[in-house]
Amino acid sequence: MYQDPTRWGITLQTYVQLTMLDRHLSTMSAPVRMMERSIYSAKYIFVENLFRSGKMPEVDFAVLSEWFEWITQNIAIPVDLIVYLQSSPQTCHERLKERCREEEKIIPLEYLEAIHQLYEDWLIKKTSFNVPAPVLVIPADDDLQKMLHQYEENREKILAGSNV
């Protein structure tokens, strides 16, 4: 995908939208469902970034957008809370390099900056798209121990899905 986003963008994002919808609608065996990403972040961040960067043709963007609109208007997709691990693009880039996954080696800092800006506009400034739930922001530039402390301070909110 990262090597040829123009070719694989529509294919991957169609599959992501389908799997995210399936994940949202699957029967829950626990009182809380935690998801790394959602059908909303797939559309508002990753599809939007592909389109804005010129790597997704307008017709592909229109088809994905129409499907997304139909899904969100006709199927209940409840979201109780969004936990935003807010981190700078530079920190994310450093962590990608440390993680050393082969498929992530070609991800440029500029890509992470674009993704970061879309998240900030959506979840912090609330200037781009509807936010379907309250947002809990946890600073994630710090080391893991500080992040764990932030999680523990907010554990009740996160696990109960209660309002922030």
Write out the residue ranges for each language-model feature.
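ATP-dependent small-molecule kinase phosphotransfer cores
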Residues: M1-E66
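A generic secondary-structure signal
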Residues: R23, W67-N74, D121-K126, G161
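Short helix-terminating capping/connector loops at secondary-structure junctions
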Residues: M28-S29, I75-P78, F129-A133
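Hydrophobic/aromatic beta-strand patches that form the interior of the parallel beta-sheet core
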Residues: M35, L81-V83, L136-I138
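Conserved nucleotide-binding/hydrolysis micro-motifs of P-loop NTPases
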Residues: I39-S41, S87-T91, D142-L144
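A glycine- and Lys/Arg-enriched "phosphate-lid" helix/loop adjacent to the NTP-binding pocket
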Residues: Y44-L118
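NTP-dependent small-molecule kinase module
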Residues: H93-V164
